[in-house]
């Protein structure tokens, strides 16, 4: 569904005052005849050098080197290799029911792999070079290239202060209803490196000598990286950590690294790279959208290192904090919408006499990710949520007990469900949508209320039990037990019509309705932001006059140590002094969510503080005629940043004031101050995005007009 304010969107460029971050130096591009050289300061005392061969028929990358500045010695990490992109192209369908104005590309329930599809490899139609930028970022475009129905250029970018080479096939197609996935890597006539290495799913380094004639093979790797080792160092290959993974129901490790000869039966030589798979990860595998004419950016990173593979992987992991969400003082990491089915599994184990009950892998996984609090969504496809009580109440008791057992001072497991009943009008051809509920303590309730059955009764075993039979009951329960509810996966999946369909209902306008949830879905690599579907909804809800928020959700089934969890995640950094213990209840988390005292992030960009006119997200401020309140934001990041925006609205339109951050180095910290135009606005929020399309955003601050 399109944003209702799409026609009133205005974007301006805003100047900002910045403090912090050192100048790492300058990237340069030089051309001499049929060669071009990109050099840049890669790290203290080291420079990177990429030599491009522009002759037809020759591999584009003549040499990838890292230089020791003091001695001038160069270590060659790869030579005579072609940066190659492979696409698998299929078609897009969006099954009903969907709103008539909703794009066919706004879909999750699709399987292009079940329809005709075909794989293609990229080829150069020429090697015309354009220098796009020098300075903090050196960038060139070379082309034209073709990859199946896509046409465009290859864009290569280096970042001063980073050992990275960022390669993107920037391509578009005119074909309608195109869905695709892509692989990327380096292909050479001769093997790349002497040995290959990666981290296996148990966290151990796996190393094997290069077998020059070995056929193409995919590997299940941890951290998404594969490394080619040579005598002078290592070259790591990895994708954008989140953008690369289109949404799936499961986070199974689908072998995203490959090596060998004849990749997909299309590569003429030996290669290494990253890859996606047509199927797997649940019942639906929707691939990536390519609306006609949009510039899709099919990206991959190469990291240069003078060290063996362990050093290259360690450096690559700095960009994701080691695939961990780092601690921030005064905040706790909260994640929501996990269908892990741990309750029914624990009940099965008990019934089979297994004692003591084992600790499921999910506890280890969440602690390893740095997560403090997990909001579960149990009984979604298992259990008996529709049972009137005899079966459901014991299942609820088991969920509460299991959450208590798995919680400790470092991890809080919060019981919850994706209930999907009563809240939302049922109209022919329209799904009222899915929603999640969270109470501040264990609450027993059934989703059925029989004739003459009281709304609330005292059960000798379970104590207070609520019976819900309609919208009024559900709303009453949420208010009485101080619970919160919100729209799951709004404007997509089974919530295609939500929350728009009930935006004027009392329950939506009430304080117990939190808002909606955000996830990077669907995938479209032409967009500079993830999850625009949800971000547009946040702006729409704010313009509706409903002071609602957008929290991050994951919405996945199953969880295991071997999974690629980090790539599919986002989290909420909630302002809390300490993590509540299970038996204390977790009312402080609900209070912080309701007040908007949190920011959402993929993990690489952290908004350590943000105020507008001295007010934090969720708070109100007054803006008078001619006032330009100061926005002050403290940021830290890993990948170099691309831009930030102050997004605001006046009840009719959405306005964006952009701050260019292309001068930022990697691994930086900065305080931004600026004064956007907010006169006549009713709300404003802040968001920021990096070159890998990782990002973070605050909740709105509410503006009261002062005449």
Summary of predicted features, one role per range:
Residues 29-32, 40-45, 53-292:
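Beta-strand/loop-rich accessory regions of lumenal/periplasmic or secreted enzymes
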Residues 1-9:
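Bacterial N-terminal signal peptides that target proteins for export
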Residues 328-482, 487-488, 495-497, 521, ...:
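A metal-dependent hydrolase metal-coordination microenvironment
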Residues 232-236, 244-356, 360, 365, ...:
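Conserved structural scaffold segments of CAZyme catalytic domains across common CAZy folds
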Residues 455-565, 637-655, 674-682:
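Domain-core and long-helix interface of multi-subunit machines
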Residues 10-20, 397:
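Hydrophobic h-region of N-terminal signal peptides that target proteins for export
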Residues 391, 422-441, 493-514, 558-576:
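Substrate-binding cleft/loops of secretory-pathway carbohydrate-active enzymes
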Residues 67-122, 129, 269-310, 322-325, ...:
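C-terminal functional module detector
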């Amino acid at each position: 569904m399109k944003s209702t304010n799409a026609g009133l969107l205005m974007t301006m460029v805003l100047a900002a005052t910045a403090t912090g971050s050192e100048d790492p130096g300058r990237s340069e591009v030089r051309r001499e005849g049929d060669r071009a050289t990109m050099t840049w300061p890669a790290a203290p005392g080291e420079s990177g050098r990429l030599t491009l061969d522009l002759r037809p028929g020759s591999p584009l990358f003549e040499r990838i080197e890292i230089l020791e500045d003091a001695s001038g010695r160069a270590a060659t990490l790869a030579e005579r290799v072609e940066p190659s992109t492979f696409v698998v192209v299929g078609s897009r369908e969006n099954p009903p029911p969907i709103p008539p104005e909703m794009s066919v590309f706004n879909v999750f329930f699709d399987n292009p792999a079940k329809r005709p599809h075909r794989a293609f490899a990229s080829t150069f139609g020429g090697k015309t070079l354009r220098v796009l930028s020098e300075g903090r970022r050196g960038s060139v475009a070379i082309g034209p290239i073709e990859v199946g129905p896509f046409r465009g250029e290859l864009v290569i970018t280096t970042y001063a202060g980073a050992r990275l080479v960022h390669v993107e096939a920037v391509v578009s197609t005119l074909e309608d209803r195109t869905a695709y996935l892509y692989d990327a890597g380096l292909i050479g006539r001769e093997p790349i490196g002497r040995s290959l290495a990666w981290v296996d799913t148990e966290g151990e380094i796996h190393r094997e000598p290069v077998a020059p004639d070995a056929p193409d093979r995919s590997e299940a790797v941890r951290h998404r990286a594969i490394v080619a080792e040579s005598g002078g160092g290592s070259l790591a290959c990895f994708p954008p950590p989140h953008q690369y993974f289109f949404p799936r129901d499961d986070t199974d490790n689908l072998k995203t690294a490959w090596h060998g000869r004849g990749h997909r039966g299309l590569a003429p030589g030996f290669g290494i790279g990253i890859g996606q798979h047509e199927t797997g990860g649940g019942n639906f595998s929707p691939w990536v959208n390519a609306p006609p004419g949009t510039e899709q950016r099919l990206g991959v990173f190469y990291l240069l290192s003078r060290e063996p593979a362990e050093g290259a992987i360690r450096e690559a992991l700095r960009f994701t904090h080691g695939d961990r969400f780092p601690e921030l003082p005064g905040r706790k990491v909260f994640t929501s919408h996990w269908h892990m089915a741990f309750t029914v599994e624990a009940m099965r184990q008990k019934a089979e006499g297994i004692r003591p009950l084992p600790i499921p892998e999910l506890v280890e996984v969440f602690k390893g990710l740095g997560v403090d609090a997990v909001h579960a969504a149990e009984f979604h496809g298992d259990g008996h949520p529709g049972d009137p009580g005899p079966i459901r109440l014991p299942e609820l008791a088991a969920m509460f007990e299991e959450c208590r057992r798995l919680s400790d001072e470092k991890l809080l497991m919060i019981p919850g469900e994706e209930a999907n009943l009563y809240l939302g009008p049922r109209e022919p051809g329209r799904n009222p949508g899915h929603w999640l509920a969270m109470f501040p303590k264990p609450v027993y309730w059934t989703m059925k209320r029989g004739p003459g059955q009281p709304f609330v009764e005292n059960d000798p075993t379970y104590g207070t039990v609520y019976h819900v039979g309609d919208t009024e009951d559900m709303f009453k329960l949420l208010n009485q037990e101080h619970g919160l509810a919100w729209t799951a996966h709004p404007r997509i999946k089974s919530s295609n019509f939500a929350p728009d369909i009930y935006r004027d209902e009392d329950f939506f306008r009430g304080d117990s309705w939190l808002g909606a949830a955000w996830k990077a879905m669907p995938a479209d690599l032409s967009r500079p932001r993830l999850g625009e579907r949800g971000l547009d909804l946040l702006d729409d809800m704010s313009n509706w006059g409903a002071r609602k928020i957008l929290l991050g959700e994951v919405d996945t089934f199953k969880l295991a140590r071997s999974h690629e969890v980090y790539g599919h995640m986002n989290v909420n950094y909630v302002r809390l002094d300490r993590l509540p213990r299970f038996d204390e209840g977790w009312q402080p988390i609900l209070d912080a969510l309701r007040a908007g005292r949190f920011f959402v992030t993929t993990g690489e960009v952290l908004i350590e503080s943000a105020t507008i006119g001295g007010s934090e997200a969720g708070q109100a401020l007054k803006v008078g005629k001619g006032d330009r309140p100061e926005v002050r934001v403290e940021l830290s990041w890993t990948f170099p940043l691309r831009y930030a925006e102050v997004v605001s609205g006046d009840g009719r339109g959405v306005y964006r004031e952009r701050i260019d951050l292309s001068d930022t180095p990697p691994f930086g910290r900065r305080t931004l101050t600026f004064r956007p135009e907010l006169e006549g606005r009713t709300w404003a929020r802040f968001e920021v995005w990096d070159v890998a399309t990782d990002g973070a955003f605050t909740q709105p601050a509410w503006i009261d007009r002062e005449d």
